[in-house]
């Protein structure tokens, strides 16, 4: 640990990227890159992270569990439906009880308000592993992936095409925080949440970022350095079949990417549905970096875990 310091964060929890400063985000990314090169750093020896899941997961569960093992700690899987919370115990009571047993909580659930209450009522760090509104851990890994390719955020254009969902929300806040240019193109009726857009625009005024919300995908990806998409059907929306027709012009394919820079990179938070939001030709092509991006979930989250746990130790 002689080359990189553990970032000092002015927060107990990470619920959205709004809680972090630009300097804290950059420090986390640099620390994550260090941990990527030094996987077995026992910085959380003996620590226990509770992992509460109300939604299915591959990347979030495996990356957090593997991350805790590599850091010398332990990740404890907790099925939300099998906990007493699933039978009516309050979020507040659950938070207070878990604070006596474990050292931190990661929760992947539906309601963002529940995550906020869990953080408020617990004395240990709480990390948002995904809600219907935000996905900050994914956005941290996305920023790390972009930074590894460019070594800067200034002058970089990220184009997000598709549904203005939780991933889009976190990317808007992330881009605004680091001063990046982000365009979003969605069908009418599927724009990102207006309040979150307002927050991103307010942050952008301070950092020099540029945020644009559009409906034209060609305009959004014009001269883009990175093109990003997500599934058209998020968890819980599987019945909305009419979305397929509406979203078809927003598919990432060889015709659309012609508008981007020739050196563009393709990003996707995964899982992907080939031939829906993206063609196999693009996601499996030479300019796709989706698996490196997925791998960075592990390293970005390890950096976050160490920083939050160490921060709580210093405050206690």
From Swiss-Prot:
One of its GO terms (cellular component) is cytoplasm. Its EC number is 2.1.3.3. L-ornithine binds at residues 166, 230, 234-235. One of its GO terms (biological process) is citrulline biosynthetic process. It is found in: Cytoplasm. Carbamoyl phosphate binds at residues 57-60, 84, 108, 135-138, 269-270, 297. InterPro entries: Asp/Orn_carbamoyltranf_P-bd (IPR006132), Asp/Orn_carbamoylTrfase (IPR006130), Asp/Orn_carbamoylTrfase_sf (IPR036901), Asp_carbamoyltransf_Asp/Orn-bd (IPR006131), Orn/put_carbamltrans (IPR002292), OTCase_ArgI (IPR024904). Pathway: Amino-acid biosynthesis; L-arginine biosynthesis; L-arginine from L-ornithine and carbamoyl phosphate: step 1/3. One of its GO terms (molecular function) is amino acid binding. Keywords: Amino-acid biosynthesis, Arginine biosynthesis, Cytoplasm, Transferase. It catalyses: carbamoyl phosphate + L-ornithine = L-citrulline + phosphate + H(+). PROSITE patterns: CARBAMOYLTRANSFERASE. It is an enzyme of class 2 (transferase). It comes from the Bacteria. Belongs to the aspartate/ornithine carbamoyltransferase superfamily. OTCase family. Homotrimer. NCBIfam families: orni_carb_tr (TIGR00658), PRK00779.1 (NF001986). Reversibly catalyzes the transfer of the carbamoyl group from carbamoyl phosphate (CP) to the N(epsilon) atom of ornithine (ORN) to produce L-citrulline. This is Ornithine carbamoyltransferase. It comes from Bacillus anthracis.
């Amino acid at each position: 640990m002689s080359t990189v310091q553990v970032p000092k964060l002015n927060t107990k929890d990470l619920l959205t990227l709004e809680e972090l400063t630009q300097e804290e985000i950059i420090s986390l990314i640099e620390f994550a890159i260090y941990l990527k090169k030094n996987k077995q750093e026992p910085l959380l020896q003996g620590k226990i992270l509770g992992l509460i899941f109300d939604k299915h997961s591959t990347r979030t569960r495996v990356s957090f569990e593997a991350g805790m093992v590599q850091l010398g700690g332990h990740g404890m899987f907790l099925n939300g439906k099998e906990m007493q919370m699933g039978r009516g115990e309050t979020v507040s009571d659950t938070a207070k009880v878990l604070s006596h047993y474990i050292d931190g909580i990661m929760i992947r659930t539906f309601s963002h308000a529940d995550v906020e209450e869990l953080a408020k009522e617990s004395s240990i760090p709480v990390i948002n592993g995904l809600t219907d509104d935000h996905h900050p851990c994914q956005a941290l890994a996305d920023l790390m992936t972009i930074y590894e390719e460019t070594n800067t955020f200034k002058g970089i254009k990220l184009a997000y095409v598709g549904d203005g969902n939780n991933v889009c929300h976190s990317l808007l806040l992330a881009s605004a925080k680091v001063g990046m240019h982000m365009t979003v193109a969605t069908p009418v009726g599927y724009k990102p949440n207006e309040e979150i857009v307002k927050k991103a625009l307010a942050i952008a005024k301070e950092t020099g970022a540029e945020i644009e919300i559009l409906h034209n995908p060609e305009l959004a990806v014009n001269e883009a350095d990175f093109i990003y998409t997500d599934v058209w059907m998020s968890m819980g929306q599987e019945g909305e079949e009419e979305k397929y027709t509406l979203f078809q012009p927003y598919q990432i394919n060889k015709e659309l990417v012609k508008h981007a820079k020739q050196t563009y990179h393709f990003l996707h938070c995964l899982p992907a549905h080939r031939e829906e939001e993206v063609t196999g030709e693009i996601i499996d092509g030479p300019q796709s970096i989706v698996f490196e991006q997925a791998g960075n979930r592990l390293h970005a989250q390890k950096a976050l875990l160490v920083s939050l746990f160490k921060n709580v130790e210093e405050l206690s």
